[in-house]
């Protein structure tokens, strides 16, 4: 009976039987250990026998995996399974990623082999920087306090990013979540608990937004620290904003605080506070547990204003408002990367706004710089499509200022910055677009005044090694220049502390300005009043500039009422465009009626 | 019944001639298999001539073989005849044994696989056409019959037909049977049937199916009416029907207790009396003994204060003394050591802390503190917090054990011998003086094992620690000298779990070798070996009164063993995967078990019935624990979730529905008993522990 030969079996492809080693594999393995020729019947017998033994070993290895509190089978489990069967375990198969083999195919066969790297002994002996693995550490934190999970970084956030996305898409789910036990263990407002006892649930009641006393105190401390004068405290506050879970309930007020702050301080030309507010935006973007898509209609206009606004500071020739524009451009690029979808077309709309400012020949030079900076951060294709064709016209704009024919020193500085920005972002793209022989004459014919300097930059890029090409889209936003710019602005600018006191103004024309500010934002916490200079010339400047401020206030009020982010961005941009014409009134026939209102007010004021 | 009576009468009447006739048929069979030397030896031993041998015909051999397979008593007689032959020739006996073993699966030479398949098909049609109230119970019959037919086809060498048979009919089974079927399908040769443990188990122990009387009569009528000899043969040999009165069970009730490798638990398995009450007399002795001693010894001015403190303590305890629990075992049922004075003081301290315990309920949820182990390179394999919540012991995959102090008190070492000799042994604070204050450390490492440490267990006296490992040893460590004092070697395979008894002195271990063993700390030999599981014993737990031990196994059963007799007194089936964790309730009557199938089942130990199944976890339940007052059940697992269950409501609902024992809960509503679910961020749970004041401590491993 035992000597009876078993019948040859076909390879089974059933799911229940699992996989089995084929006879072909047995032949390959036999060849690898020196067996010249293995018959088909012997290969089949061996394949079946080995398959059964392997399955038993894997089943035992699963037991060791379960008892080690793991869910991944590792090489060590197989070793212990062999050890239980009194078989010598395999040595040299320790791998961190659980797959110690590499795959290769050649000669019509598929092979898996063990990767065996050659190690240079010289390198091992020369470098003594082998790190000792970290020692065991035991950390403890409060997991649950009387049935409520505290929102410490060790605990999961009470409302994950996916839940916040679901809330924004379908608000009706909130009514069901109020009765769900899963949400009951998380720190929430008392409104949801009260709703359990109410038989009739109104949708309107869910719109109320309650903050606990601790959250209100946290909000107050964070906002005061972020815009205060204490720099270390601001760093801690931004760190908390960027990493703490559980801030989603304060997020609407945070975004409103940033949006209103930008509106007020851009009128007041307060560069330092604008920089602080942009750093708050960056901290909120870095927080992994916050879902910001619902608040883009407030954040994007604020960031866009900091990029393309005509004037961001009191002294354009002294303060470094260019650093703020660069920082805000990188923020806008990150926002487009995070939130751009096929439905909202965020990047397309942002690109259109920047290119519209670039197309306009009467754009202020500061706004022109902001548009170029914004477009350059959005990627190489954007530079190729929108900036390169306009290089000739930009050269014609900045040539008079750089050659010294312009009287204004501010415009000269702006032209220099525009040239530096173009020389930084355009050469890598031009290197790919144009062929190898670069001549100054060709570049001058194509790009005008900036041609020779661009030609030198392109030649330099071609001669440099490939590894040193500057990456245009850098993920890390550098905050060092923005911090130093903020300190400079704080030192130079004569800004008083935040106060609600109204100081006396010598000029009669200043009184309507102050009254207009207070009428539009009566509840605003930070109202900054600029002291007037006793010089008569400065008084003339203040008196002459009162009309643009009124226009900007009207534009800001108009933008606040608009719920569409595109319309808001257009409003801000148009407000900036209007300021480029000092005292000249320009009427565009095809504009919207709101813009006509602004134009009419500007005409009456002048 | 009448057939059985006639068989017995016929057998008794022809005892002598039947015995000789069986011998002649055996000789004929041996001759048929060409075993000449064995034949000659057996003829000489039995004084049988060749003339008598020729009188036996082929049909007589078949009849005797059929009788041997059917009757169990004939096996003993045949073995008796075999014993002289075994001493003479080993290889011939081995082949003969193999042939006879395989003959168990072969009824005749002309084996017909188609005949079996047809019989199974008719049985399946019968089950599908039966009434709805009986269909689910009758469908429990399909799996064991399918497996036995598969064995028969495989034993005859028709492997391809066997695989086709399984492929065709496996869709009838429930999901949890497919995994067990996969193990059986690893068999591909007839010889492997003799070595597989599951096959041997299904042959020796019958597959148990609980069925109502009506369903059973329907099934019997089907077998008899349609002359299903094949199915009737399998049923009589391999199935056992545990019938009960009342209505048939529905789908949920059938699935609740099915899934084990040996079917369901018999009623007989849970018949024995279990004393699940707690040992209360021990506490009173500890309290009454030290009461007069300090009063007599004290001559200090503080003497008047001590009697005042003692008197309020005595009154509530003395009132409890009058009560006697009928379910509690007597104090001397198993021998327990005398408590030392220091241990009595520890118990007094524990009782005082228990009086300050927070009463947990649905409105008063517990607070939890989470201990996260960072930078563990080979993973935390176990974690254990001492009963007084002062120390945490973790076992790792790199064979080391590490102990952390969870209080500001440091882990100190015993002083050296010279310093100890100078100490005053009679002083009150001898336990504090003998420790070296300069040697305090926050954490200590214990090295000695050569494999991953799968369990650590603190002694109730807080001076000893047990650990078990993959290297098949159990080590006892001293928490005073921080060294290994005993190595217990009894298991030859990896030891999965080890637990100290709540009263100390005894501990129990379980292993890959399918046994659990009871040890005493002062002996190298196991006192009891609990044998009965069909696969690995994965977890073990002592009853609060130290008289019983519960074990969970990879054969998906939970058993309760009596430490005094070593017998299995409860067998509970219902899990669909390996049992991974066990916990006794504070009162001792209920047992909670968690499994790899993500479920938690509550059992009533008074009769072994299933109370309820808790469905919430999405991965292995690695740890279960009850609160000190027994009102909250906390469970956690590898899905990074901690769930709190209202155990008070579970027991209330169970006692109020206790009238019908044979029927379980009709509906498994998931959220009836669930109080709260707390997810952790990135840490699967390794251990849960309630302190004496009902603060929950969680230990997890940070998964980077």
Curated annotation (Swiss-Prot), chain A:
GO terms for biological process: RNA polymerase II preinitiation complex assembly; transcription by RNA polymerase II; transcription initiation at RNA polymerase II promoter. The modification Phosphoserine is found at residues 546-547, 550. The keyword Phosphoprotein applies. It is found in: Nucleus. Belongs to the TFIID complex which is composed of TATA binding protein (Tbp) and a number of TBP-associated factors (TAFs). Taf9 and Taf6 exist as a heterotetramer. Interacts with Taf1. Belongs to the TAF6 family. This is Transcription initiation factor TFIID subunit 6.
From Swiss-Prot, chain B:
Keywords: Nucleus, Repeat, Transcription, Transcription regulation, WD repeat. One of its GO terms (cellular component) is nucleus. It comes from the Eukaryota. Pfam families: Beta-prop_WDR75_1st, TFIID_NTD2, WD40. WD repeats lie at residues 376-405, 448-478, 490-520, 532-562, 574-604, 616-646. One of its GO terms (biological process) is transcription initiation at RNA polymerase II promoter. Residues 287-336 are annotated as: Disordered. InterPro entries: G-protein_beta_WD-40_rep, TFIID_NTD2, TFIID_NTD2_sf, WD40/YVTN_repeat-like_dom_sf, WD40_repeat_CS, WD40_repeat_dom_sf, WD40_rpt. It is found in: Nucleus. Residues 314-324 have a biased composition (Basic and acidic residues). Belongs to the WD repeat TAF5 family. Belongs to the TFIID complex which is composed of TATA binding protein (Tbp) and a number of TBP-associated factors (Tafs). Interacts with Tbp and Taf4. TFIID is a multimeric protein complex that plays a central role in mediating promoter responses to various activators and repressors. May play a role in helping to anchor Taf4 within the TFIID complex. May be involved in transducing signals from various transcriptional regulators to the RNA polymerase II transcription machinery. This is Transcription initiation factor TFIID subunit 5. It comes from Drosophila melanogaster (Fruit fly). The lineage of its organism: Eukaryota, Metazoa, Ecdysozoa, Arthropoda, Hexapoda.
